[in-house]
Amino acid sequence: MPGFTCCVPGCYNNSHRDKALHFYTFPKDAELRRLWLKNVSRAGVSGCFSTFQPTTGHRLCSVHFQGGRKTYTVRVPTIFPLRGVNERKVARRPAGAAAARRRQQQQQQQQQQQQQQQQQQPSPSASTAQTTQLQPNLVSASAAVLLTLQAAVDSSQAPGTVPPVPTTPTGEDVKPIDLTVQVEFAAAEGAAAAAAASELEAATAGLEAAECPMGPQLVVVGEEGFPDTGSDHSYSLSSGTTEEELLRKLNEQRDILALMEVKMKEMKGSIRHLRLTEAKLREELREKDRLLAMAVIRKKHGM
């Protein structure tokens, strides 16, 4: 590599590559030269040479001076931040220790992941307790529904009598509930929810059969049909359209199409006429330009 390379052992700064650094020759003063040589060679330090004798071709970079540059106050290099030259290398750990450490870290990570998965999964005891708590509530709700339906049937059979207030087997008053409310049961409730739903459907079917002598009817709640908008325009056809009306509508459509064809032909004729006019105007402009150019040429030549 061209340029000067620092002569300090282990330092490879080059004057051609490291433009920001300064490179100095060894001083001619005997005392300064001795101090420089002592600090640079560092006799007795492992990895350094004690028989170094600098020449005019040796250079020392500014990295080894306090402040990054040699001045009148800083004349001796004292900074040698080079590992392996000014300090002993730390003994390398054997490969077996590094492998054991990596295995230990992997085991710790696996244990942490297993603990997190166990925390995320719900315990079976908790789910069982929740199911046992929900079952009495479902039974009481189904009993209240049956009592309400029985009261409604009694009131429909005896219109003049006042319906009694339904009570639960424990003696508590139960208010009538709205059967149109939709109750969503969780999947964990299992067979208890299915039994309650089947009882509710059977009771509802019995009530509808008792109230309606014509038989059970299907009632859809929450869905509305599309309103009958009627014949809003001339293209709509009602269910009672006769053959004469249909023919009349078809004739109207044919008349409209014929009129549109006539208009399109007129527009095409207008476009053709405009194109011819444009071509004539362009030809006139070219003729005028030619005459003007000839007049200019004649004027230049004095003709």
From Swiss-Prot:
GO BP, sorted A to Z: cell population proliferation; electron transport chain; negative regulation of neuron apoptotic process; neuron differentiation; regulation of mitochondrial transcription; regulation of transcription by RNA polymerase II
CDD domains recorded: cc_THAP11_C (cd22291)
> Which UniProt keywords are given for this protein, alphabetically ordered?
Activator, Coiled coil, Cytoplasm, DNA-binding, Metal-binding, Nucleus, Repressor, Transcription, Transcription regulation, Zinc, Zinc-finger
Instruction: Report the main location listed first in the record.
Output: nucleus
- One family from Pfam that matches here is THAP
Q: Where are the zinc fingers (THAP-type)?
A: 6-64
Subunit organization: Forms homodimers. Interacts via HBM with HCFC1. Forms a complex with HCFC1 and ZNF143.
Designated name of the protein? THAP domain-containing protein 11
Q: What is the lineage of its organism?
A: Eukaryota, Metazoa, Chordata, Craniata, Vertebrata
